[in-house]
Amino acid sequence: MPQAQPPRATRGQDERIVIETDCLAAEVWPNGYVSGVKANTLVDKKSSARDASFGLDIIDFLMGPGTEGGVAYEFNNLYHGKIAKHYLELPQVCTQAKHVESDFVVGGDFVVVRQWWRWRKAAPGYKPGSLWEQTLVFPMGRRYFISCDRVESVNDFKDVFLRTDLPGHLQHKRGDNFEEVYLSYEGRIPASDFLEDFPPDGRHLYQRGTHPLPSRMIRARKIKGEGKPWLAGITLDPAIVCEAWCHQRGYICFIQEIGRLPMKPGDSFAAAYLIGYFDSIEEMEREADRYRGLTSLAATKDYWLLSEGVILRDGDGRFRIAPQGQWPAPSPWRLVAHGKGEAEINGRRLKIDGEQTFEVPWAK
């Protein structure tokens, strides 16, 4: 049996990054409509399915709850419902940044892409410049990629969250291209429920604190057609999700918000996801359990690291795991490492060979 070709990544037209593994093809565009994986470019080689989205893991704003303390946010309408919020740092990354910095590296059995940008405007009393950084890892042998969004604050925030599209909005015409939606905190929902527009708080809304915390945070749609898979977004730590929408507004809006935590200047918070194709809900659950509770991703040419907390690079082969904002830190930290090489994390030297789970001590 012939061996699979190694993973590949190249720069194409307009600086786009073109990625290919044995299971997936994808593109990341740092110009135009930016962040995440470009709309309709995530191709499942097994089924030829595409994502039918506006993009996967797409980034918007830094926001806060309620009407006080920031730039006004329109609500009491069909698009935003009756949920009061305000903007803290803006503009919207996906539509208004126009260009984000990016790089990529090809490892032995994966491709890693990084994108980053700083918000240019801020609400009164705050300063602009908080950093958004996104890391995407495309492993061989998997029909999904691993993604992580990290925010590093330049402000003292009492209660901040990041708005994302996760896995990504679904473009459709009266349910023509999907059979059903699955939300782990609610269940299976037929396509017929998304024929007419309704607000995010009309139905299928998840809010941390008012809804039970699910054991898994899975949001997926079943692509229509014989042999077609589910496209899913799995947030590996359900507790980092503060709100999630699944409502119809000409398309199915899969907004997901992460955080709602206090931060000091220099603090970071992050969430990690699996995004891609699965043949069953049971398969999604197995992969969610495989990396349950992990929130942050970093990578070199030799290995990738998926950890609790927020993993930060301190130098060549040296990393530090920090708490999520001002939330208390567990001790020790759990870390999954994949690849081959050596890494120093919180002062502990790790030898990585294959995919292994480690415990790393707390370090200030």
Model segments located where?
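C-terminal beta-sandwich/jelly-roll accessory domains of carbohydrate-active enzymes
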Residues: 301-364
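Beta-strand-rich recognition/accessory modules
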Residues: 12-22, 203-315, 340-349
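Acidic, contiguous internal or C-terminal segments within carbohydrate-active enzymes
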Residues: 102-174
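Acidic-aromatic substrate-binding/catalytic surfaces of carbohydrate-active enzymes
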Residues: 14-122
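Polysaccharide-binding surfaces and accessory modules of carbohydrate-active proteins
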Residues: 155-230, 347
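Short, Gly/Pro- and small/polar-rich lid/capping loops
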Residues: 2-14
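Short, well-ordered beta-strand segments enriched in hydrophobic/aromatic residues
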Residues: 19, 23, 134, 145-153, ...
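Short, acidic/polar linear motifs in exposed loop/turn regions
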Residues: 153-157, 279, 325-327, 339
